[in-house]
């Protein structure tokens, strides 16, 4: 369970206990299909671990509380929640996500002057149009930004969610 100020649905690898016993079930889960259920927050934490050498900070909503005169009442102090994977795994995933932006399906996420990594996704939802996903990060001038975008029943992740993710990354890097 993610320690968070708001309720968060738990992720789910499989609804039926025997699904992950089969090689087909494992393969479907590995590429984000099958019975896997995740939220944008959970996926944003995965991308955060990628850019933080495998560690996940405890997520928070409010960074700072100020009085009307501008003085600080309270400021959030970032803490590490857990280690998701090793430094080496984080570097490998980061390199793959950057490669995807430079050469793969996520090329539309390029931002001039920034190092950008991304992963598009198109999640099947029965007989309905698929959910469009984009998970990405950008690094520029010492700033690291992570986004997770899902557009329910939006279609292709590369065509629908990626442009939204790129716009969010660019706005955050530009201080908007």
Per-region residue spans from a language model:
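Short, gly/Ser/Thr-rich active-site loops of penicillin-recognizing serine hydrolases
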Residues: 70-79, 162-176
């Amino acid at each position: 369970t993610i320690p968070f100020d708001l309720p968060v649905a738990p992720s789910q690898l499989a609804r039926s206990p025997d699904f992950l016993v089969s090689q087909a079930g494992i393969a479907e889960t590995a590429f984000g299909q099958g019975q896997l259920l995740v939220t944008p927050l959970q996926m944003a934490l995965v991308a955060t671990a990628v850019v933080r050498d495998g560690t996940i900070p405890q997520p928070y909503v409010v960074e700072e509380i100020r009085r009307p005169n501008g003085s600080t009442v309270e400021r959030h102090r970032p803490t590490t929640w857990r280690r998701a994977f090793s430094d080496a795994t984080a570097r490998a995933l980061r390199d793959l996500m950057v490669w995807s932006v430079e050469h793969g399906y996520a090329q539309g996420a390029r931002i001039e002057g920034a190092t950008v990594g991304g992963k598009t996704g198109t999640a099947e939802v029965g007989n309905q149009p698929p959910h469009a996903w984009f998970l990405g990060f950008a690094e520029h001038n010492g700033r690291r930004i992570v986004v997770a975008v899902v557009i329910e029943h939006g279609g292709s992740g590369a065509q629908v969610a990626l442009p939204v993710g790129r716009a969010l990354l660019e706005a955050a890097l530009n201080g908007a």
